[in-house]
Design a protein with these regions (language model features):
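Active-site loop/oxyanion-hole signature of alpha/beta-hydrolase fold enzymes
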Residues: 15-18, 22-76, 86, 248
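Flexible "cap/lid" loop of the alpha/beta hydrolase fold
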Residues: 82-86, 90-129, 134
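Catalytic histidine-centered segment of alpha/beta-hydrolase-like enzymes
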Residues: 231-247
Length: 258
């Protein structure tokens, strides 16, 4: 199972969930992926799109000795999973999207928390004496301490011993813009043969509009290989807000047709 983070995340975000997943489902292994221009996957050639990120997964599978049987993606990573499913026709594949709507989000991206974080990063220096100095600068600029500490996972040590923010923010903007405009509903409307898809929605999140929720429910009613799960107490960060509830879904017995 591939585990994919969201924008400005890293593969480490899903380490705890992945470990518990393979403990509960020992026939599976887990691969924590740094998506392009995140973590250790820096400097890949463009274009920087959801489709390119999905192609990276196909290339990753080609480099492994074992086949990939599934993928889970949060937020941006969820749309990467949906795009990746286009290449999975006739292959047994278990796919999970975590609070990731198939809809384009359009102009609303400019008011999102992620866009505000990027604006903050762009206004700050590129180098800091330490991780603590970076966190302090982010907090002083108005970001919550938890967000600043999470972003610090992207820091890299320079040859001079300083810290610099690893991802190229221009590339990150390209990825966000493509994600914001991507419409993945056709994947759900004609789910590739051999694939199952579970969509997990945070009950306190606004990522899925009321019409989105209604539409995925209708699709699930028509296709037994699509399931929708609402975790009422979770916000967008489902794996943080309700880790146990998410694990219960990921490790629940599959129905015969799945």
């Amino acid at each position: 199972m591939l585990f994919l983070h969201g924008i400005l995340g890293t593969r480490a975000n899903w380490r705890g969930i992945a470990r518990r997943f393979v403990e509960a489902r020992p026939r599976w292994g887990a691969i924590l992926v740094d998506l392009r221009e995140h973590g250790d996957s820096l400097g890949l050639s463009g274009p920087h799109t959801v489709r390119a990120a999905a192609a990276d997964l196909t290339e990753l599978e080609g480099s492994l000795a074992l086949p990939i049987g599934g993928a889970l993606g949060h937020s941006f990573g969820g749309k990467v999973v949906l795009e990746w499913l286009r290449s999975r026709q006739g292959q047994l594949t278990e796919a999970w999207t975590i609070d990731s709507s198939p809809s384009p989000i359009g102009a609303t991206r400019d008011t999102s928390a992620t866009a505000e974080v990027i604006r903050t990063l762009e206004a700050l220096p590129r180098h800091w004496a330490s991780g603590e100095a970076f966190i302090a600068a982010m907090v002083e600029a108005g970001q919550p301490p938890a967000i600043a500490q999470w972003l610090a996972m992207n820091l890299r040590r320079t040859d001079g011993g300083e810290r610099t923010f690893g991802p190229d923010l221009g590339v990150i903007r390209d990825l966000i813009d493509d994600y914001a405009n991507a419409d993945s509903w056709d994947v759900l409307e004609a789910l590739p043969e051999g694939c199952t898809l579970d969509l997990v929605i945070g009950g306190r999140s606004e990522v899925f509009s009321a019409s989105d929720r209604e539409r995925v429910g209708q699709l699930a009613n028509r296709n037994s290989n699509i399931s929708v799960h609402l975790i009422e107490r979770a916000g967008h960060w489902v794996h943080v807000d309700a880790a146990d509830a998410l694990l219960a879904l990921l490790t629940s017995p599959r129905s015969p047709q799945r």
